[in-house]
């Protein structure tokens, strides 16, 4: 991917600032690694809370870094409790907005005075951490915003202000959240066709005009227009029309994904930089050995991501629905995946499925999805999971939880034709039916064929040296980070 820099004096210095949740940290780490390969000195800024979690999950030396790839931390402003701070997104968003600017500014002031690192020359910040813009402007350096959502999800967020102006949000009270309301056709977001209000990110469905997430999204979407450029973890063939529509209302937008494919092409897994990880949970790799014993396309992979919370009743419906399929399955079940209590599976279920299932608390998902034994994915439709599934050619059963997962579900099922949605009020009979359809049915067969085609296009986008995402990454490095472009 182009030339490398050599001496420390020449090195540009990028500061990478992810939003402090797992689904944001992982893709930012990939961007940071790719920039390091390009010759950048990297400072990666976690919150103190996540910095300490990474040390616990990956070992005491996990964040020692390299001379040219260093880790720093700033407080998130939340009180120290036994509760996982990354799970309460409204509290986390409110706190980072109010409390992170001053510590971040002090951190950069300290870095600037150091003689053993190059001067800070650019910032890559999560789009939801826009307080960093104030510091970038003060330093006079370019800042790229990395929105870790799909382009369709991001496009919806950009138009949240119009929902308020049109009186669609907030609603008077919960009784207004009717089927008729949710089926309201939204035909005024550019390049998003056949979309209903129920397909828009969940933060829009509120009764509170002071709703933290509603106002947070509106604010961050507005402030992102001050960035030098915007990058998205998607690829042009997948979301071309939406990305083109963004170009007229935002700074230059560059799709540079799927990032995991780009990283796999550029960085050796067992190299020093390749071994750097960002998982807040300890990965259990035994599942890969288990998958090695299974037939091609025979296993259902089940993972609802790092934030999804369900009730005990929902957990049981999924469990018994999966049991009824007779299929082999690998289920990632976080201990905190059930609201207010530890996830507990009935002994009867464990006994009935003993010879055809594996349960784990966290896993190396990219390796799991690319394993030939995996034939389907029961997912919450988080964007990292959706994109990884698409680029591995694996069709999905979609159970969106919150944020833009509803939008990802809509596009996965109707536009990209790789998903089947399951109702929010999950029932074991429906779980059994859709999983059987996914794995054995005619619709499932067509979805798998479509997923394989998306895999081909994802690989094409990240193929060296001329894939569209490869070229876009070169452009953001050379035109934006190494030579500030005008904010258009």
Swiss-Prot record:
InterPro entries, alphabetized:
UDP_glucos_trans, UDP_glycos_trans_CS
User: PROSITE patterns, per this entry?
Assistant: UDPGT
- Leader sequence range is none
Question: GO molecular function of the protein, one example?
Answer: glucuronosyltransferase activity
Q: What is its EC number?
A: 2.4.1.-
User: What species is this protein from?
Assistant: Arabidopsis thaliana (Mouse-ear cress)
Where does the chain bind UDP-alpha-D-glucose? 306, 363-365, 380-388, 402-405
- Specify the protein name: UDP-glycosyltransferase 85A3
Keywords in alphabetical order:
Glycosyltransferase, Transferase
| Free-text tissue specificity from the UniProt record | Expressed in roots and flowers.
Disulfide bridges in this chain: none
User: Looking at its record, which EC class is this enzyme?
Assistant: transferase
> Which protein family is it in?
Belongs to the UDP-glycosyltransferase family.
* Keyword Transferase appears in the UniProt entry: yes
